[in-house]
């Protein structure tokens, strides 16, 4: 039997009152033992789903708790590194010879773009 989505099943749009929902889930029977067994089964499934969800939530909380103490240090280090990078970029004065390959690449790119547009104009 596939596991039922109990959290979704008991969402606010699924029923008017919890008793109405339980009445939908429990079989119609005048036999109290059948109602008892069915309700115990439903309770067991709901309990399992709830425990599984709580276990996942607990794992996520533990993961966040492990990272949180290091977060200020990580942010501080990132801030420090970004400032150093910015300062080193400000001081950098590129030599004209260093820009030559970039200028050549830009010239090649613009020539390719011009060639493509000319080909597009030739094609009907």
From Swiss-Prot:
Chief site of localization? cytoplasm
- Keywords of this protein's UniProt record, alphabetized? Cytoplasm, Nucleus
Traced from the root, the source organism's taxonomic lineage reads: Eukaryota, Fungi, Dikarya, Ascomycota, Taphrinomycotina
Q: Which organism is it from?
A: Schizosaccharomyces pombe (strain 972 / ATCC 24843)
Subcellular location field: Cytoplasm; Nucleus
Q: Name one GO cellular component term.
A: nucleus
Q: What is this protein called?
A: Uncharacterized protein C1A4.11c
